[in-house]
């Protein structure tokens, strides 16, 4: 397990390299990330490279047993590049170059940019690839932030459309361009995307932008991989919500996935916390608060490649702008770290070592504050590093255990950003661009509250065999799969037929792969499997109480929010309806045995109470009983992973100020104290506390102890098929 921080000696106000690295070594840090943000330092003038400045950093790290990930500094271009090559500036709209002064303002598909970037990368990698401290390379940083409107990008988009559709008549038909007199007679007739109102156009444009990002990272990774030794890995730093990015696609050219995991802190990390899934007073880029948001990001990061991942950046203390000052309460950093480990992280790296004294991120806090003196943050992280050393082999090669899977779709997210079904804070013709995230959050949060762990998977990652899908994913929740190919819907149907429990939600299957609404009674191809249909739907402005309809069924309770499909059962059992004079004629939730499996249709966006009760029922009807999740205080969560030795490692958290007792369902051993604790014992959890408990470690090889034996840092090696972490 690697543990460390991004380190920028070039940002320090005075020379303190030895002091910084000594502090890291004393804290037990094992890795740093360096060099990724300063093209103008590496190449202050075109063709003039200054490479020596990193040598003492890597040497000092190596002398202290600290490894390094070197970043290629291509995401923040120097002023001379913008001045001499203005054509490389990214356009935020047709003819509208992004003003210089931030970062990620270059079109990385432009040949001039690629030429300059390749020369830079070859020079840096050639100098440092053989340094003994270097274990891997981060190519670029947080790609996909921008949507490029450059002329050459638009022409490339036209070429892409020609290849895909062949002729304009096919495009006219597939996109429905008869509407509003948009029919093309020639490819030159296609208008720029700035004023576009056609959903099919926008979806194709967003897919093309994602393709540009993937092609760039593929090019970049191949370039570096061809220059470095076999035992060094290639990754990038994925910001999970970038608009020009499909996270499952970006993982393909990488050896190991790397992601940012940022989360709300202080009371924003409390459980139960707020019922509303939004960030409130927390940093603008944190979509909503509570530990469920933290776990969703962990699961998304693992879903990039369906493999363990690296946390490239996470909170050290306050994150965000000058008015986002929410340092973590004591214990919260430890809780967050162990949640990441439980869900597959093989490295935890903080952004960053020291708070900057200048620049846009002056108040994005580092491990050391502006005083550069160790304080509470440093002490708490050093204690975590000590726990890593103490845990030793027990946390090497952990395999997260999951109960259900959730299907997330980049296409559906993009389509709903353009034409969202839910209403936002103010009326808008095209709805709330956060509609997809709101629907996903509603269902994920219910699963989390019910104690269920989730695997995130994309449509492209589904196996073609429904039997294999059932074996790997006995319950599959499909939130808002608005864009779906016929083949995907058929696989979902066959999945249920083969024995899986398929959970459908509003908007699933409504449009085809071109974002064209299907001309069939919904849910279309899934109607026979669902045993229910609908022909009308409505936005819901005020929460509507859900009523139980099946006297022998689950006691579902809570409210319908935001949306309601007017479900009519035709063979399905109606589990719940609406307490409403109009909606009361429809079902809210149905379930239908189909083949060897089951399809449950949830026709609304559930509030937290309804989502939790629904998840409890799903677990009861489709999953083995698990006392670890079924009898917990409301502030406690329990997740688990299988160790390399076959034992089960339980991570028991208390996400609150008040201490709490958790009665253990089974015999365990405390990972850190070695104490054996019998089933039925009240485990004491302090404020913002986490306990690691080993259950059934009889599978450890003879002579092996799952105990405090120190272990060397894990060095990721080999992608698929060449390198793995």
Regions found by a protein language model. Give the residues of each.
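Conserved, mostly hydrophobic/aromatic
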Residues: 5, 24, 32, 61, ...
């Amino acid at each position: 397990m690697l543990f460390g921080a991004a380190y920028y000696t070039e940002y320090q106000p005075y020379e303190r390299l030895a002091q910084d690295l000594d502090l890291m070594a004393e804290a037990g840090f094992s890795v740093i990330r360096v060099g990724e943000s300063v093209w103008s330092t590496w190449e202050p003038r075109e063709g003039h490279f200054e490479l020596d400045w990193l040598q003492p950093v890597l040497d000092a790290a190596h002398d202290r047993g600290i490894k390094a990930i070197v970043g290629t500094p291509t995401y923040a271009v120097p002023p001379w590049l913008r001045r001499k090559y203005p054509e490389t500036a990214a356009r935020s709209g047709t003819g509208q170059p992004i003003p210089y002064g931030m970062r990620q303002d270059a079109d990385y598909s432009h040949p001039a940019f690629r030429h300059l970037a390749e020369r830079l990368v070859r020079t840096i990698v050639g100098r440092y690839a053989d340094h003994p401290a270097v274990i891997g390379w981060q190519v670029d940083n947080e790609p996909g932030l921008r949507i490029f409107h450059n002329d050459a990008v638009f022409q490339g988009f036209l070429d892409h459309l020609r290849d895909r559709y062949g002729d304009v008549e096919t495009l006219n038909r597939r996109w429905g361009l008869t509407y509003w007199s948009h029919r093309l007679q020639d490819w030159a007739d296609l208008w720029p995307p700035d004023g576009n109102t056609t959903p099919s156009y926008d979806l194709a444009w967003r897919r093309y932008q994602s393709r540009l990002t993937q092609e760039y990272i593929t090019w970049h990774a191949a370039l570096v991989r061809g220059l470095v030794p076999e035992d060094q890995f290639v990754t990038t730093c994925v910001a999970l919500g970038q608009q020009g990015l499909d996270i499952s696609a970006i993982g393909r050219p990488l050896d190991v996935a790397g992601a940012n995991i940022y989360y709300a802190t202080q009371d924003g990390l409390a459980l139960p916390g707020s019922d509303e899934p939004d960030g409130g007073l927390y940093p603008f880029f944190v979509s909503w608060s509570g530990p469920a948001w933290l776990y969703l990001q962990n699961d998304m990061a693992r879903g990039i490649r369906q493999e363990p991942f690296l946390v490239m950046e996470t909170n050290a203390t306050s994150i965000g702008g000058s008015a986002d000052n929410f340092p973590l309460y004591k214990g919260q950093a430890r809780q967050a770290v162990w949640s990441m480990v439980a869900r597959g992280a093989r490295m935890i790296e903080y952004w960053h070592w020291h708070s900057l004294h200048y620049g846009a991120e002056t108040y994005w806090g580092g491990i050391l504050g502006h005083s550069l003196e160790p304080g509470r943050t440093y002490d708490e992280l050093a204690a975590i590093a000590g726990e890593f050393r103490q845990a030793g082999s027990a946390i090497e090669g952990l395999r997260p255990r999951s109960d259900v899977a959730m299907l997330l779709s980049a296409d559906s997210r993009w389509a709903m950003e353009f034409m969202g079904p839910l209403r936002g804070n103010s009326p808008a013709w095209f709805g709330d661009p956060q509609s997809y995230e709101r629907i996903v959050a509603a269902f994920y949060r219910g699963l989390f509250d019910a104690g269920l762990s989730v695997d995130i998977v994309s449509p492209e990652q589904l196996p073609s065999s429904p039997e294999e899908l059932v074996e790997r994913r006995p319950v599959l929740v499909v939130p808002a799969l608005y864009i779906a190919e016929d083949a995907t819907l058929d696989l979902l149907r066959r999945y249920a037929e083969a024995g899986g429990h398929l959970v459908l939600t509003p908007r699933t299957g409504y449009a085809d792969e071109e974002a064209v609404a299907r001309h069939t009674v919904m849910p279309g191809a899934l109607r026979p499997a669902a045993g229910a249909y609908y022909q009308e739907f409505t936005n819901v402005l005020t929460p509507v109480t859900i009523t139980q309809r099946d006297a022998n069924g689950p006691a579902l309770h809570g409210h319908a929010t935001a949306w309601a499909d007017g479900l009519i059962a035709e063979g399905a059992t109606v589990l719940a309806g609406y307490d409403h004079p109009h909606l009361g004629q429809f079902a809210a939730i149905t379930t239908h045995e189909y083949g060897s499996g089951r399809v449950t249709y949830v026709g609304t966006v559930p509030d937290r109470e309804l989502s939790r009760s629904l998840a409890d029922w799903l677990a009861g009807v489709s999953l083995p009983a698990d006392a670890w999740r079924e009898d917990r205080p409301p502030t406690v969560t329990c997740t688990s992973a299988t160790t390399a030795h076959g034992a089960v490692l339980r991570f028991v958290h208390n996400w609150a100020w008040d201490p709490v007792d958790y009665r253990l369902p089974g015999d365990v051993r405390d990972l850190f104290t070695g104490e054996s604790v019998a089933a039925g014992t009240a485990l004491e959890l302090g404020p913002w506390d986490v306990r690691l408990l080993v259950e059934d470690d009889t599978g450890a090889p003879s002579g092996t102890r799952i105990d405090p034996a120190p272990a060397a840092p894990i060095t990721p090696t080999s992608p698929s098929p060449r390198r793995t972490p």
